Amino acid sequence: MVDISTSLLSVKKEKIIDTVYKLEDANTNYFHIDVMDGEFVENDTHDIMLEYCEYLDNITKIPLDIHLMVKDVKNFVDSYLIFNPNIITFHYEACKNKEEVMQIIKKIKENNCKVGLSVKPETKIEEIYEFLPYIHMCLVMTV
């Protein structure tokens, strides 16, 4: 079976609720939430994505797939764990060191959430080998 995770990044605020209902009818499996802080990446979507998560929390049971493209991963994890997402993916390169990567993995898993670890294409995959037994998904960014 194939799962579909639908990104809400380009949905206009005034259409979010209608769009969510249409995507439910289309049997999407997850809502993909692209969280950007304007520091780790150029765009800043944090406020609107947080607002979308609040809407989703009230109108649907479809699980969330949170993708954190942020510099301060620890604080953003806390902001999104309250929505009980299915998975939170964060960027290896956003962490100060490997200890911080493991701390974040543990924190996410302690909250009954799956963990995804994202890497930039130029990052040597060997750098994350030690984390593979502890994560559910590895995402190699190409954007």
Residue ranges and their predicted role:
Residues 1-87, 95-98, 102-103, 107-109, ...:
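Conserved N-terminal beta1-alpha1 strand-loop-helix module at the mouth
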Residues 92-96, 143:
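Short, acidic/turn-prone active-site loops that include or flank metal/cofactor-
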Residues 118-122:
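Short gly/ser/thr-rich secondary-structure transition/capping motifs
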Residues 137-143:
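Active-site rim beta-loop-alpha module in soluble metabolic enzymes
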